[in-house]
């Protein structure tokens, strides 16, 4: 008889526990490790941290803050890469005793923040605007000593070397040669001479072509 009463007492205790839970609601159960079980008729409210979070990856700013240092709307600096070139100065059979070093300006301009040894920085206002080319900016004069073969006396010569480079803005109009008229009528007439009419010369050329076989 004692064995049959034990399961009955266990069932009564479980039933009493469920009745107490239904009277108090599901919020009485709380999982301290991960989450809180909400009520059956109530929806969980999103935490305020997610609503006020400004560092989320959004489509309108590409996952970056609104004021990003590399924003395309900001003014960025463009400059040339500094390339040193060493060569000897020659004048016929004579050659300089020591090589000279100068800068070589070639290639396109790049962002100054990506070029640690950049020179000749300029402001670039539009990212999709005109193209920039690296060209010589300033020159310096240097006198070198030339040594000639055959026991001739050494002589000196003054050479011109590139001292700095700069970025020159080239627009699309520079490459549109079809828009420019290179005809003879656009040339300026020389002083002291009257411009020759073009129609007369055209008739003379036409007569020569007719007589040619």
Swiss-Prot record:
Residues carrying a glycan: 53, 175
One GO term of the biological process aspect: positive regulation of DNA-templated transcription
Organism: Rattus norvegicus
Keywords, ordered alphabetically: Disulfide bond, Glycoprotein, Heparin-binding, Secreted, Signal, Wnt signaling pathway
Main location: secreted
Gene symbol of the encoding locus: Sost
GO molecular function: BMP binding; carbohydrate binding; DNA-binding transcription factor binding; heparin binding; molecular function inhibitor activity
Function as written in the Swiss-Prot or TrEMBL entry: Negative regulator of bone growth that acts through inhibition of Wnt signaling and bone formation.
The protein's assembly and partners: Interacts with LRP4 (via the extracellular domain); the interaction facilitates the inhibition of Wnt signaling. Interacts with LRP5 (via the first two YWTD-EGF repeat domains); the interaction inhibits Wnt-mediated signaling. Interacts with LRP6.
Protein name (Swiss-Prot/TrEMBL): Sclerostin
């Amino acid at each position: 008889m004692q064995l049959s009463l034990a399961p009955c007492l266990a069932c009564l205790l479980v039933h009493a526990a469920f009745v107490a839970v239904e009277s108090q609601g599901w919020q009485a159960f709380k999982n301290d490790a991960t989450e809180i079980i909400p009520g059956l008729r109530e929806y969980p409210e999103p935490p305020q941290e997610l609503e006020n979070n400004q560092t989320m990856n959004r489509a309108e700013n590409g996952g970056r803050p609104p004021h990003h240092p590399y924003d395309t709307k900001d003014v960025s600096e463009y400059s040339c890469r500094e390339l040193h070139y060493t060569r000897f100065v020659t004048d016929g059979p004579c050659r300089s005793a020591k090589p000279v070093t100068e800068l070589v300006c070639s290639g396109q301009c790049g962002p100054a923040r990506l070029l640690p040894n950049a020179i000749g920085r300029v402001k670039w206002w539009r990212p999709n605007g005109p193209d920039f080319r690296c060209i010589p900016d300033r020159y310096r004069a240097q006198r070198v000593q030339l040594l000639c073969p055959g026991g001739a006396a050494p002589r000196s010569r003054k050479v011109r070397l590139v001292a700095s480079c700069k970025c020159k803005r080239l627009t699309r109009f520079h490459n549109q040669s079809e828009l420019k008229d290179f005809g003879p009528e656009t040339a300026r007439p020389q002083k002291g001479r009257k411009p020759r009419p073009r129609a007369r010369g055209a008739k003379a050329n036409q007569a020569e072509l007719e007589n040619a076989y």
